[in-house]
């Protein structure tokens, strides 16, 4: 019988639902119902409930940056990371707690997606001169004209590294700060291209974070699983991460939740902060 249903409260009851309209067939009933809803909406002048928040199928950078919770994060001097799935709120990282960020994945497409996402956020928030990209894999050349320094494949990166080291040492000497963000799009290729020494990396990471220099290190999990002085140092000193893979498929960070995991899409990540992971939606 149409409109007949079971409703479970303390006990199961049989109920009969009635529509406020009639019609000769289902299509006519539906059409009449739509008209009735429209007239009720037009007549109602009182308060209405808020829309149920939903994570969109695809999140653009403009949509993300214009979310009220994203704007609030920026006003509070926080770096917005992504949108969590439960409350559909922006999750962000306070700059007062932001040292450096590791992006970890087992897929090249996911690494590229997360890197693009973070670069776009930085470009929305900061002057281009405050951003440097070391892009040894030449996957992000579309940003070359939008940042202060872009060092691509087969380009000399030593001069830029030396300049960063000098700025860090000068700022430490003068007890001053300078806000600057360095995105390394593939750590393995960058280490090969730059011949950076472990002590150089240590200086940039440890002294840099004291004067406002922030690195975003993007790497495949296989590189970080290797045993070199560079990888051992990174694993010991990087404790905030965007993990674009199942937590159970990596061994760098301990899982904070042991529930069943689904494979992540390229626009989904785990934000690992203070030993807890939160699943987030990022932009495409």
Specify the residue positions occupied by each region the protein language model found.
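Phosphate-binding and hydrolysis-coupling loops of NTP-dependent motor/remodeling domains
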Residues: 1-80, 225-284
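P-loop NTPase catalytic phosphate-binding loop
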Residues: 66-239, 246, 283
């Amino acid at each position: 019988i149409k409109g007949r249903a079971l409703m479970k409260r303390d006990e199961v009851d049989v109920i009969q639902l009635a529509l406020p309209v009639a019609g000769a067939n289902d299509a006519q009933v539906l059409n009449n119902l739509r008209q009735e809803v429209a007239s009720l909406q037009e007549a109602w002048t009182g308060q209405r409930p808020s829309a149920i928040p939903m994570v969109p199928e695809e999140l653009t950078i403009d949509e993300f940056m214009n979310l009220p919770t994203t704007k609030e994060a920026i006003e509070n001097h926080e770096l917005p990371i992504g949108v969590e799935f439960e409350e559909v709120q922006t999750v962000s990282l306070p700059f007062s707690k932001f040292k450096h960020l590791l992006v970890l994945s087992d897929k090249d497409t996911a690494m590229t997606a997360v890197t693009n996402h973070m670069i776009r956020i930085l470009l929305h928030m900061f002057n281009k001169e405050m951003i440097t990209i070391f892009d040894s894999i030449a996957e992000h050349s579309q940003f070359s004209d939008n940042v202060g320094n872009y060092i691509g494949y087969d380009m000399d990166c030593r001069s830029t590294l030396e300049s960063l080291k000098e700025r860090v040492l000068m700022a430490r000497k003068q007890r001053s700060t300078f806000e600057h963000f360095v995105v390394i799009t593939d750590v393995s290729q960058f280490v090969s291209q730059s011949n950076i020494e472990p002590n150089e990396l240590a200086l940039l990471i440890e002294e840099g974070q004291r004067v406002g220099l922030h690195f975003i290190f993007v790497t495949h999990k296989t590189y970080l699983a290797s045993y070199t002085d560079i990888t051992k140092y990174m694993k010991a000193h990087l404790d905030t991460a965007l993990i674009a893979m199942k937590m159970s498929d990596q061994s760098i960070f301990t899982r904070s939740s042991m529930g069943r995991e689904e494979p992540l899409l390229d626009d989904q990540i785990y934000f690992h902060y203070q030993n807890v992971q939160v699943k987030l939606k990022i932009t495409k």
